[in-house]
């Protein structure tokens, strides 16, 4: 009986957070960009991911808004809530919103979305400074997507809200 309870607890704990394929590709593309600048790669951080996921989900509630604020809380509050520690060092949060239409047959949608998000962040002076800061060692990215038909056969609209949280501490 103890073994069954442990297995159930382990499965629930392990599934409490889950990166999507797109989330992983975003981090991969961010590391490719950093590598092109001879910067160290970012290591995945569960705390950064959970903080990013919380903000991305919040952004999806109202597609007309894009903000770093979440009902009076900021990135530090979200990171502390996601982390096992109440202390953190240097934190950064980069956010993006975009909408794209893709053919239903397109097999590279996630790759294209991730590439577009990195380009958006590169073009923003402040977001690029966070993304390319040598102090940053850990990161987690979360992208949420609202999908809708656009009235043209074979095409779908993707409205994306993405957040990446970066930190110098795990």
Where are these regions (language model features)?
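Sec-dependent N-terminal signal peptides
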Residues: 3-14
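An exposure/low-complexity boundary signal
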Residues: 13-18, 160-161
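A generic structural signal for short
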Residues: 18-19, 106
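Short, well-ordered surface patches within globular domains
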Residues: 19-82, 137-140, 144
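A well-ordered secondary-structure block
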Residues: 75-160, 165-168
């Amino acid at each position: 009986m103890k073994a069954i309870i442990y297995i159930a607890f382990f499965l629930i704990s392990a599934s409490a957070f889950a990166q999507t394929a797109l989330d992983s590709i975003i981090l991969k593309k961010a590391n490719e960009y950093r590598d092109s600048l001879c910067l160290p790669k970012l290591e995945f951080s569960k705390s950064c991911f959970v903080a990013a996921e919380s903000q991305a989900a919040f952004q999806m509630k109202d597609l007309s808004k894009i903000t770093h604020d979440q009902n009076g809380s900021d990135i530090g509050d979200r990171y502390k809530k996601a982390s096992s520690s109440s202390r953190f060092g240097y934190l950064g949060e980069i956010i993006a919103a975009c909408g794209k239409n893709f053919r239903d047959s397109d097999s590279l949608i996630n790759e294209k979305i991730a590439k577009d998000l990195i380009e958006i962040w590169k073009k923003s002076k402040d977001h690029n400074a966070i993304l390319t800061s040598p102090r940053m060692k850990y990161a987690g990215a979360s992208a949420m997507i609202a999908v809708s038909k656009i009235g043209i056969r074979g095409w779908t609209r993707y409205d994306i809200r993405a957040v990446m949280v970066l930190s110098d501490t795990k």
